[in-house]
């Protein structure tokens, strides 16, 4: 299984994330997440929080510099009208927390794919408050386009999320 693995940062590609999606099987709402750590420091997993949906894998515990983590989420099994929506948190060796939000909704008549990244001061776990902070603070639409921003603390982000119900999200955190 690829999801839950750590790979060389340079090998994080859409093809790898397509394989992570395929591992999830026939699920109508799912996401493959790849986050490349080019920050110069190491990261330790805090937790993943799901507002809706779930995962079948454990968040990779330790992400050294120049390595990338692979993770996935999916809607609940069965005739459930949920998407794969949540946030994850990594404590960084610089003493701050990397928060990442993803939203692959069930109903595309009302919602779109959204994502965002933020660095929080100190140590913080992913929860409903982190999810809401990221979701309601000018997030990026999953529009098949690359986006970038300065995260503060000497870090920047470049990322992309696809618009499909079987979404791919790739993020690179660098100095």
From Swiss-Prot:
The keyword Transmembrane applies. Residues 9-28 are annotated as: N-terminal region. GO terms for cellular component: extracellular region; nematocyst; other organism cell membrane; pore complex. The keyword Secreted applies. GO terms for biological process: cytolysis in another organism; monoatomic cation transport; pore complex assembly. Phosphocholine binds at residues 52, 85, 103, 105, 131, 135-136. Residues 103-118 are annotated as: Trp-rich region, which is important for the binding to lipid membrane. It is found in: Secreted; Nematocyst; Target cell membrane. Pfam families: Anemone_cytotox (PF06369). Residues 1-10 are annotated as: Plays an important role in the hemolytic activity. The record marks 111 as: Important in the initial contact with the lipid membrane. The record marks 141 as: Interacts with the lipid membrane. InterPro entries: Actinoporin_PFT, Anemon_actinoporin-like, Cytolysin/lectin. GO terms for molecular function: channel activity; toxin activity. Keywords: Cytolysis, Ion transport, Membrane, Nematocyst, Secreted, Target cell membrane, Target membrane, Toxin, Transmembrane, Transport. Composed of a long N-terminal alpha-helix and a core region rich in beta-sheet structures. Before the pore formation, the alpha-helix binds the lipid membrane, partitions into the lipid-water interface and stabilizes the monomeric molecule on the membrane. Finally, it traverses the bilayer, thus forming the transmembrane pore. Hemolytic activity is 3.5 x 10(4) HU/mg. A synonymy between H.magnifica and R.crispa is controversial. Octamer or nonamer in membranes. Monomer in the soluble state. Pore-forming protein that forms cations-selective hydrophilic pores of around 1 nm and causes cardiac stimulation and cytolysis. Pore formation is a multi-step process that involves specific recognition of membrane sphingomyelin (but neither cholesterol nor phosphatidylcholine) using aromatic rich region and adjacent phosphocholine (POC) binding site, firm binding to the membrane (mainly driven by hydrophobic interactions) accompanied by the transfer of the N-terminal region to the lipid-water interface and finally pore formation after oligomerization of monomers. This is DELTA-stichotoxin-Hcr4a. It comes from Radianthus crispa (Leathery sea anemone). The lineage of its organism: Eukaryota, Metazoa, Cnidaria, Anthozoa, Hexacorallia.
């Amino acid at each position: 299984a690829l999801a839950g693995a750590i790979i060389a940062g340079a090998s994080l590609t859409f093809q790898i994330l397509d394989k992570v999606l395929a591992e999830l099987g026939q699920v109508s709402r799912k996401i493959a997440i790849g986050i490349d750590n080019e920050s110069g420091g190491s990261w330790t997993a805090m937790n993943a929080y799901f507002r809706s949906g779930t995962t079948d894998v454990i968040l990779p515990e330790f992400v050294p510099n120049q390595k990338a983590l692979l993770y996935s989420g999916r809607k609940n099994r069965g005739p459930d009208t949920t998407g794969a929506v949540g946030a994850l948190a990594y404590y960084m060796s610089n003493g701050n927390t990397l928060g990442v939000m993803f939203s692959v909704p069930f109903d595309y008549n009302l919602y779109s794919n959204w994502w965002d990244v933020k660095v929080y001061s100190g140590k913080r776990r992913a929860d409903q408050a982190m999810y809401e902070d990221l979701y309601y603070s000018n997030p990026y639409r999953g529009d098949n386009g690359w986006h970038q921003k300065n995260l503060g603390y000497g870090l920047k982000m470049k990322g992309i999320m696809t618009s499909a119900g079987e979404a791919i999200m790739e993020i690179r955190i660098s100095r």
